[in-house]
Amino acid sequence: MRLFCPIYPIIASAHRSGNVAGARGNLKSARKSAAVFRGLQRKVVNRQYVFASAALSARDEPQQRESGGIRIERVGSYSRPAGPTHWSVLLAMRYGLQGNHREDFKMTKTNDILSNESLGFDPDVLAQRYAEEREKRIRPDAETQFVQLSHDSPFANKYLEEDPYSETLERAPLKDQREVIVIGGGWVGMLTAARLSQAGIHDVRIVESGSDFGGTWYWNRYPGAQCDIESYSYLPLLEETGYVPKLRYSYASEIYEHAQRIGKHFDLYKDAVFQTWVTELRWLEDESMWLVTTNRGDTMRARHICLGTGPANRPRLPGIPGVEQFKGHSFHTCRWDYDYTGGGPTGGLAGLADKTVAIIGTGATAVQCVPALGESAKQLYVFQRTPSSVDVRNNAETDPLWAESLEPGWQRDRQKKFGEAFLGGPIDPAFVDDGWTRLTRNLKQLVAQSEEKISGLAQIADFKTMETIRGLVDETVKDPEVAEKLKAYYNQFCKRPTFNDFYLDTFNRENVALVDVSETQGVEAITETGIIANGQEYPVDCIIYASGFEITSSYERRLGIPIFGVDEKSIYEHWEAGMRSMHGLMVSGFPNLFLCGGGFVFQLGANYAHGIDVQAGHVAYTISELSRRGIQSANVSLDAEERWIADQLETKGGGFVLGGSPDTCTPGYYNQEGTAKRYRNVRRETYSKGVGAYMKLLRAWRNDGQLDGLELK
């Protein structure tokens, strides 16, 4: 991002030295080495420094007015470009400082606000535009607009059971016993098994539906697929496996290879079973064991069960009339058909050279694969209901000298700093400086004012950020009409932000057409030969569904496993009034059962892998401690569940909310397709204090050593 949102009038962060000139408003050519250090805060905190979009200003008596309950200041300016660096330039110039200090400082001022003139837009006009864009996309069928795939549907079977990357593996049914069975072989399951191994628990079996480890990264092999979190923080267990990613943002092939690396390093392949779906879990009270049955005829027993299926394990399809009638070729992006398209994850889709292709969906997946489709297809139609916000990626190869200089503990430290920075904490560019942290930098620590005032300031900052991103569309896309349709008119975090250096430019190609379907709330129908949108039929040879996963459907549906606990009670019956647990991990009436990563998404942050590692370590500690004490059964008390719910209620709303309310966002999986009000239940929401606070909470529980809240036998 070339410009950052103008939140610096509230908190300025100066961290670089630079060349400055002159004194007061008359800049001269004399060069100085500028520096700003913490002691300067005492001198400037009571002065009026205002950040504007194109210039910096310093006035002792700013002119003020009121607008919409927010104080506005009109100021003059130095004729010098603005930006984070120039705070240090301005202040060093002001006080004649010299030197090479590089320490950060924060300057808090409660009444320095931007004017509409300096903003370059009218917040009221933008707010109205956002509301209009939301309303025209709201559908009464909400989440039911998507096809619910089931194993009984021949049409859906290829998205649930067929594996385009491997032949079926035959094996005899298993009837053995394990200390721990982990269900799921993606990051959640692998991290849980790895942390169990480190805790001395080696009798562990992973049951995975795919043909290898990797989970999402086994299935998602579409061209251009890559992580959107810095790989040094996202790829788990880097230090443990002695690996440093080749790129700052790894592509899917490298991530899948790392999953295999983890499996080999921790010897997880030895007892794992692949191409296997668990069909039921049943607690055997007289044995204090779980009975696990599968589609392969297995009847395994386990002392402990770890559910690690993750949130993106079930693809979804749009419920477009006629979707099953199409006579051409079709597939979901998570089951990419390279036999049809040719090429591979890096592109070169030669099989599409004479094909007219349609892709439905413009979320994070489409942003990554559309460039390769545009390069290869004879004609590409991109059907878009809501555009993604697309910022620059700026990927780069890993510096080998940097990789060699890393000290023990580097990844945990980096993950910790990313989590803090994402939630508005201090940022050290030497560790974390990417698109995510640029979007959220300093938003939490705005001003020591009321929550209402902070919300207003955050909204202005969000407007400015999105104006910058919309400006990038204008700079990149040559056709003004197409550019306007590609602009995202909603708050930054209404949808998962995307970062890509090739997506927008793809719409400059003559063989690529954007089909906006916002006015009709989506594609109208699919025929035997094509797609009907806006009353027009588009004949196509192939339809690619970039429609994502059932992220927010019920846990019962996403998991797809009947679970029966004490007295043969179903866990879904226990959750009839909403999901409930202790720590988001254990459920009363279901002894020795751990929900890892999928049931309760506790962290308000972007790096999911870090969050599940926190849970995996805690689960490993709990199981190893139970084993050490000779405990056969550990059941959460109802009181412990109620205390956790009470804690959730107490902290609800206390976390840092990025962007706008789900009630004001355009429809998407973040707000249950625009119906967030209906589904609000504190038992389903994030742990609003964030992953850092969650880590401290679990650490305190472990340090107490009492296994508080567990009924032990």
Q: Which residues fall in each region the model found?
A:
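Hydrophobic alpha-helical signal/anchor motif
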Residues: V20, V44-V45, I70, V75
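Short, Lys/Arg-enriched N-terminal segments with co-localized hydrophobic residues
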Residues: W87-K106
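N-terminal FAD-binding dinucleotide-binding subdomain shared by FAD-dependent oxidases/monooxygenases
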Residues: F37, P62, G96, T108-V180, ...
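Glycine-rich Rossmann-fold phosphate-binding loop(s) that bind the pyrophosphate
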Residues: G184-M190, T362-G363
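Short hydrophobic alpha-helical segments enriched in small aliphatic residues
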Residues: A12, R16, V20, A30, ...
